[in-house]
Amino acid sequence: EYNPFGTNTQSLYVYFETDSAVKVSYTIHVKEDDIADFSRNVYQDEEYQKEHEFQVIGLIPDTENTITFYITNEDGSTDTKEIVYEMGSLYGEEAVQLDTDVKQSADKLEDGLYVVLGNDSPSMDFMYYYDNNGVLRGEVPLLGYRSHRLIFDENSMYYSISEKKMAQVNRLGQVTKVYDLGNYKLHHDYVFDENGNMLILATDTTQDSVEDIVLKLDVNSGEVTEVLDLGDLFGEYKKTCVKNSSDELDWMHINTIQYIGNGSVLLSSRETSTIIKVDNIYDGPVVSYMIGEKDFWKDTSYVSLLLNKKGDFTIQGGQHTITYETDESLADGQYYLYMFDNNIGISETRPDYDWSSIGLKVSSAVDGKNSKYYKYLVDENEGTFELVDSFKVPYSGYVSSAQETGDNVLVDSGLKGTFTEYDADHKAIVTYKMDYEKFIYRVFKYKFDGFYFEKSE
């Protein structure tokens, strides 16, 4: 049945039973020569089973799709069944085939689908799934605003569907719960802790300031609690800030949250170009330390919280999508932290600070030479951070994302409307270009193994 739950316009719901236990895969073929076949192995609870219920994704709009199901028995023999489905039109205006600039063999790309989050537009909002050929394989309608990332638990996928709502969706594409955040608006990011609670970046609409709250959502009960107000931790600094050009007191502008265990989180503050570690988030939050520019914080009581910069490099400016990464080769108390370093120097709420004095000379959203992928080694024992890897990427003063995927790095330069997957030597493999009205907010790659598709070994 075509898209019965309304959550992906390029999907089919499939159900059938077999006499013996089998596993299932499918291939979607269209007659258009420039669109390659799309093949996936279906997720099942058991490797071989008799009852089969799943979602086929990847149909091509406005054309006849030939879907071949491969039904494989435990002895390895395979039966096939073919259906033809003519899909109608997309809801949105997005391209079915992105413009691509292929620099190296596409075999070097990691497996997965590029999920384009927030191609901001005044009309209907969507999440898009594109394959490695730049072909659209999923159009996921939202109520409004944007999704910020996909997060998963054992049986569900979660994403934001409006400024005040999160959705829980199962493997079939059925919305199983919608969570309402009440007086709070979500923004930018959300993450699970080790107990399956969701931490969500938010604005308290009853307060004078924005984007400075963290909420806890219990996904079982739907209960929403405020666990952190940065105004409580940085009250003295908040008093010195002024409203920005949108007449908002966006004094911190937290744009990423990473949960790192034991009640500790890392927060990325775009407005202060600072990364903040907060401990005890559930019972008396305290700032453990910060990674930022000492000169920016020098006349405040918070300067003593800054880690020491080790080596000679320009600090991150207006960074996005900080990502916490552990490695067995590192000592306890050490970790990697990588990010999209927008390489912009601006704080509208602190207009007197001259970012160019510390090397961040560009304050324009679009007119910079380049942004960067930055990777720090943070050493909590020594109280230091050092730049261990970086490379230049197309400039975007705001939004954007970086994601390590396998040995590669995926970078979205949001205000350019492009995303590129780079190899382990930081050489571009393929760049994809989208039509966009304002920007592409983020692009992350997901394999969907264990969700839509079979778990990889």
Segments the model singles out, each with a brief description of its role:
Residues 29-33:
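Short alpha-helical hairpin
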Residues 34-47:
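Solvent-exposed serine/threonine-rich low-complexity stretches and specific carbohydrate-binding patches
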Residues 2-28, 49-53, 57-457:
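Histidine-/acidic-rich catalytic cores in large beta-rich domains
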